[in-house]
Amino acid sequence: MSKIVVNIEIQKDSNIKYEYDRKRGKIVVDRILRGDFRYPANYGYLEDALDWDGDELDVLVYSQEKFLPGTSLNARIVGAMKMIDDGETDTKLIAVHDDDYRLENIKALEDLDSKWLEEIKYFFSNYKNWKRPGITKVSGFENTSWALKEYQECKDLMREYGHLPKKEFISKMMKMHPEKYEI
């Protein structure tokens, strides 16, 4: 079990897609989701980890509460959702709010409601389909051990390449690690 501090970008049940802009150091509005799509979880990022899509590593925070964009909270990693977004690896760590006594019993993905896991899989498989069908692909869930390895790998990427502009990072990584991209 790993403790992390998650910076919240998007509140659970929001239809507004916010995104952290590392260059400006701010959370900005990216777009409004289409139709009745709403985020099924609080959505945040880890500022010390860079995912293969050139953005900070994403975290879905399981909680009964909604947290405002721009807030930080303590969480513990319980797994991950493997995802490809427009050809780029875009992993979502799954964590639970660590300061909520009601969630103390959740130590692994198996402790979460399977319907909630199906809901996040459906959401992330479909929320961009209006752009192009199949733009996002969710290949499944991984356990805590896998998630912690992915987090460490992304921390290493941030340390080595976090200074690069996003497009330059992706171009470099596509050559060095083609297995992380679907082109």
Swiss-Prot record:
Superkingdom of origin organism: Bacteria
Subunit structure: Homohexamer.
One GO MF term attached to the UniProt entry: magnesium ion binding
NCBIfam families: PRK02230.1
Lineage: Bacteria, Bacillati, Mycoplasmatota, Mycoplasmoidales, Metamycoplasmataceae
Function: Catalyzes the hydrolysis of inorganic pyrophosphate (PPi) forming two phosphate ions.
Keywords: Cytoplasm, Hydrolase, Magnesium, Metal-binding
Family per record: Belongs to the PPase family.
Chain sites annotated for binding Mg(2+) 1: 53, 58, 90
Residues reported in the UniProt entry to bind Mg(2+) 2: 58
GO cellular-component term (any): cytoplasm
Known catalytic reactions: diphosphate + H2O = 2 phosphate + H(+)
InterPro entries linked: Pyrophosphatase, Pyrophosphatase_sf
Residue numbers binding substrate: 17, 31, 43, 127
Enzyme class: hydrolase
Protein name (database record): Inorganic pyrophosphatase
